[in-house]
């Protein structure tokens, strides 16, 4: 018989840097889960990733106070800012000059990485979604 699920916890934690301090500790403590065990397992699962990369994680809490978790790919904004080599997007999109630029080939690479977590039917659709995200962040999309 399957375990009874009592809830889900969605967090975004830097790769390899999970620790019991907020936001991890309070979120898991409310569900009665072993915080240190999660931190050890998460850090082990993300040690191959670039340190500090934001990793979305969905933690499933069970009635017997055990858990399982699924890591997802980092957010689109992380990849777009990294491709454009900028720290953050434009605070006033459309009013000021673009803060950076990304090429269509960079968008295609990001789309291939993110495709499993995106709500798109094909790679071209995912590229268009990323182009829209880039424009809303104040990045210019160029051919190439």
UniProtKB/Swiss-Prot annotation:
Entry keyword Zinc: no
Post-translational modifications: One or more lysine residues are methylated.
Signal peptide positions (record): none
A single GO BP: translation
Keywords: Methylation, Ribonucleoprotein, Ribosomal protein, RNA-binding, rRNA-binding
PROSITE patterns noted in UniProt: RIBOSOMAL_L11 (PS00359)
Keyword RNA-binding attributed: yes
GO CC annotation, single: cytosolic large ribosomal subunit
A matching Pfam family: Ribosomal_L11
Single GO molecular function: large ribosomal subunit rRNA binding
InterPro entries assigned: Ribosomal_uL11, Ribosomal_uL11_bac-typ, Ribosomal_uL11_C, Ribosomal_uL11_C_sf, Ribosomal_uL11_CS, Ribosomal_uL11_N, Ribosomal_uL11_N_sf
Listed PANTHER family: 60S RIBOSOMAL PROTEIN L12, LARGE RIBOSOMAL SUBUNIT PROTEIN UL11M
Chain's role: Forms part of the ribosomal stalk which helps the ribosome interact with GTP-bound translation factors.
NCBIfam families assigned: L11_bact
Assembly: Part of the ribosomal stalk of the 50S ribosomal subunit. Interacts with L10 and the large rRNA to form the base of the stalk. L10 forms an elongated spine to which L12 dimers bind in a sequential fashion forming a multimeric L10(L12)X complex.
Record-linked HAMAP family: Ribosomal_uL11
Family per similarity comment: Belongs to the universal ribosomal protein uL11 family.
Designated name of the protein: Large ribosomal subunit protein uL11
Organism name: Granulibacter bethesdensis (strain ATCC BAA-1260 / CGDNIH1)
Source species taxonomy: Bacteria, Pseudomonadati, Pseudomonadota, Alphaproteobacteria, Acetobacterales
The encoding gene: rplK
């Amino acid at each position: 018989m399957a375990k009874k699920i009592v809830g889900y916890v969605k967090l975004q934690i830097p790769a390899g840097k999970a620790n019991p301090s907020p936001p991890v500790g309070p979120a898991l403590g409310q569900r009665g889960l072993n915080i240190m065990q999660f931190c050890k397992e998460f850090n082990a699962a993300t040690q191959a990733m670039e340190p500090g990369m934001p990793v979305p994680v969905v933690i499933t809490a069970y009635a017997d106070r055990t858990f399982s978790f699924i890591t997802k790919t980092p957010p689109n904004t992380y990849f777009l800012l990294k491709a454009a080599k900028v720290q953050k997007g434009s605070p006033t999109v459309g009013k000021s000059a673009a803060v950076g630029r990304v090429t269509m080939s960079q968008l295609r690479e990001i789309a291939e990485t993110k495709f499993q977590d995106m709500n798109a039917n094909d790679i071209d659709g995912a590229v268009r979604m990323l182009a829209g995200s880039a424009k809303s962040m104040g990045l210019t999309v160029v051919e190439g």
